[in-house]
Structure formats: C-alpha cells, structure tokens
C-alpha cells in the first residue's frame, strides 16, 4: 500500500538515500519476527525499482517507550541494528538514548538530525 500510494508516483525521479523512520503501529510480534527479512526485501526492491543499486538507507531506530516495552519492540530495535551489519549500504541511527520514555517521539530531534547528517558526510 505504501508503495502504490506514495513511492510508485515518484519512480521517474532519482535519489541516493532513503530515511526510513519506522512507524510504531506495526511493531507486533509477527512483524518483529520477520523484520530483518522485511528490510532486506524493502532495500532490494527499492534499489531495483529506482534503478539504483547503490541507494543508501538510513534507518531511524524505534525509540524506547514505556508503553511499548517488550519482546516485539526490542526485537525490532535489535533487528534495526543488525540490518546495518548484514545489509549493504544500510546505517542505523540509534535513538534509544534520546528518549524520555513518556512521549513516543523523541524530544531531542536535533540530536537525531545531527546523527543523520554525520552519516551523510
């Protein structure tokens, strides 16, 4: 659905880097158990469709959150880090350390932004 509604429309255009800020609503146990394979498929298909085998992906790690603690959340966080080691041209921006655990979105977005900029240099 994301592909058809958003990405397919921009296929004629080119870009070098994708920032993947994972949505919190699809962080279930089932999704956590296939998350690394999902990232492999995502990166592979986007590189193929946009005809750019060197397309970089920067993944913004799920933030820590008290209401979301548990297996699925932590598994996705760890798979996001694992992706950096196992999928070419993938980097993960850690954000567990800039969270207050109350708001699902980290308040220190300047820190996250700087980490992204540092990866792009």
Task: State what each model feature region is.
Residues 1-121:
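Cell-envelope and extracellular/periplasmic
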């Amino acid at each position: 659905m994301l592909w058809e509604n958003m990405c397919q429309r921009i296929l004629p255009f080119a870009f070098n880097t994708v920032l993947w800020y994972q949505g919190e609503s699809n962080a279930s146990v089932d999704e956590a158990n296939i998350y690394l394979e999902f990232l492999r498929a995502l990166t592979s298909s986007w590189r193929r469709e946009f005809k750019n085998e060197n397309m970089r992906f920067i993944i913004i790690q799920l933030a820590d959150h008290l209401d979301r603690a548990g297996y699925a959340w932590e598994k996705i966080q760890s798979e996001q880090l694992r992706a950096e080691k196992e999928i070419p041209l993938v980097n993960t921006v850690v954000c567990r350390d800039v969270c207050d655990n109350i708001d699902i979105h980290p308040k220190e977005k300047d820190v996250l932004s700087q980490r992204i900029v540092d990866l792009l240099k």
